[in-house]
């Protein structure tokens, strides 16, 4: 494709190195130079630099990272007198979302260096990295990287002779998707059942152990060292005015070359598909998710939507985690959304009635539609229950369950009707299966 937006490998630029995860390899690629720059600045100057860069949270909401850091009270009285904590949300668990795990596995020192700089900026002496417990190889890599940083003197007492002390703790979660919600994550870190907290107070004032806390996504923190190293103007030269910089787009599903594609914010799915070899041979795009299973689905008519926070929002969806799940015409949209609904029903923490009861009944209706027992009233009932959940649950899990249902009925209502009229799914699930080519390595 002529004139397509170029890829911008920054966090992924040396993933192909034989030992990309090691301290030595990271140092060969300017590793920990950004930390030296930060330690020659005041914490407030580091915070201001991140603010000016326009870096937005890469975990879904897109809130300004520097602005979030700035909410931490500073001074010697009230909440400001308490210890400050940095918590990194590495509990990546949503269907389709798969950027943080390869980032931590291939280049964990980006995250470690970013955590040190972020902790310095908010004046925290303890940082916690909360990792999904099932990804044991990632846990081992990350703990190894932290140990290397301790050994090199980048973590611990009096880092770089600056008088700054920091301890980093890598904590394994127990597999609950709800712990990806920042306040549920804090409860889990404190040893309690992970459930969302009532806000206010917000974590910036009363977070971990009732102390001022910043909770950031893995990619958000890992993006900080390149900004400190290369400057604000370099970062803002990529992306758009309101959504500057680079990010990882995760392509999966019916695409020729699935994987991570690092590009400026604002690139389009058409361009990314071109880099990825297009939809699998002999098929065409039917629908896709811009930010994982919790975001409203989009269709082929949205191929040229800029993949930044404003562009995707204007199209009626959310950029979210940039998990681009690609589905071709062989896919039953009812089955796909039904599987996501089962996930949200299973992962609901049960704290609030709309989500606990709503996701249960949504899953029952999808089961009826697939087995041929559905009625036309069930389609309207799906919308009715989704409306009851959307915006009325205690946290965003309920919204995530409702969004793909509402959007799928908007774009593919005829498919739902076909399930009722034909008393079951008219699609053969074998057609949409992805089979490894003969001779492929496992």
Label every PLM stretch briefly.
Residues 114-118, 265-282:
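Short amphipathic, charge-patterned alpha-helical segments
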Residues 33-52, 76, 82-84, 90, ...:
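Ferredoxin-type iron-sulfur electron-transfer modules in oxidoreductases and energy-metabolism complexes
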Residues 267, 279-280, 288-294, 343, ...:
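Active/binding-pocket-proximal capping segment
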Residues 1-193:
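Iron-sulfur-cluster electron-transfer modules
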Residues 65, 93-96, 134-139, 176-179, ...:
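Flexible loop/turn segments at secondary-structure boundaries
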Residues 36-79, 237, 250, 262-263, ...:
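Accessory "access/gating" subregions that flank catalytic or transport cores
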Residues 139-265, 277:
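Hydrophobic alpha-helical positions that pack around
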Residues 110-114, 247, 336-339:
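Well-ordered alpha-helical segments embedded in enzymatic catalytic cores
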């Amino acid at each position: 494709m002529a004139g397509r937006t170029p890829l911008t490998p920054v966090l992924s630029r040396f993933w192909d190195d034989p030992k990309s995860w090691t301290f030595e390899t990271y140092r060969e690629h300017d590793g920990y130079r950004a930390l030296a720059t930060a330690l020659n600045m005041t914490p407030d100057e580091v915070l201001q630099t991140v603010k000016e860069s326009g870096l937005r949270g890469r975990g879904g909401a897109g809130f300004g990272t520097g602005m979030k850091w700035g909410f931490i009270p500073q001074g010697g009285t009230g909440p400001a007198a308490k210890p400050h904590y940095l918590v990194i949300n590495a509990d990546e668990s949503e269907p389709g979302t798969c950027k943080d795990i390869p980032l931590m596995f291939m280049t964990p020192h980006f995250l470690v260096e970013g955590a040190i700089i972020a902790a310095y900026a908010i004046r925290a002496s303890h940082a916690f990295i909360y990792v999904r417990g099932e990804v044991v190889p990632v846990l081992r890599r990350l703990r190894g990287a932290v140990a290397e940083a301790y050994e090199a003197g980048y973590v611990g007492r009096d880092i770089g002779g600056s008088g700054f002390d920091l301890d980093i703790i890598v904590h394994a979660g127990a597999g609950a998707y709800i712990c990806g919600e920042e306040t549920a994550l804090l409860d889990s870190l404190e040893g309690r059942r992970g459930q969302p907290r009532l806000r206010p107070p917000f974590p910036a004032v009363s977070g971990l152990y009732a102390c001022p806390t910043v909770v950031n996504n893995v990619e958000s923190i890992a993006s900080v060292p390149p900004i400190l190293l290369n400057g604000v103007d370099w970062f803002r030269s990529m992306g758009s005015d309101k959504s500057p910089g680079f990010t990882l787009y995760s392509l999966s599903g019916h695409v020729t070359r699935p994987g991570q594609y690092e590009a400026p914010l604002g690139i389009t799915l058409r361009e990314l598909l071109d880099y990825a070899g297009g939809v699998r041979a002999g098929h065409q795009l039917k629908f896709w998710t811009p930010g994982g299973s919790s975001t409203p689905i989009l269709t082929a008519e949205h191929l040229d939507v800029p993949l930044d926070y404003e562009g995707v929002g204007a199209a009626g969806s959310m950029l979210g985690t940039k998990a681009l799940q690609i589905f071709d015409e062989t896919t039953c949209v009812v089955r796909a959304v039904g599987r996501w609904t089962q996930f949200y029903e299973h992962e609901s923490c049960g704290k609030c009635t709309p989500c606990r009861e709503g996701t249960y009944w949504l899953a029952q209706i999808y089961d009826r539609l697939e087995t041929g027992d559905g009625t036309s009233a069930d389609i309207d009932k799906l919308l009715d229950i989704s409306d009851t959940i959307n915006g009325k649950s205690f946290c965003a899990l309920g919204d995530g369950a409702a969004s793909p249902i509402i959007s799928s009925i908007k774009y593919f209502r005829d498919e739902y009707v076909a399930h009722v009229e034909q008393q079951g799914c008219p699609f053969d699930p074998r057609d949409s299966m992805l089979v490894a080519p003969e001779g492929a390595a496992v």
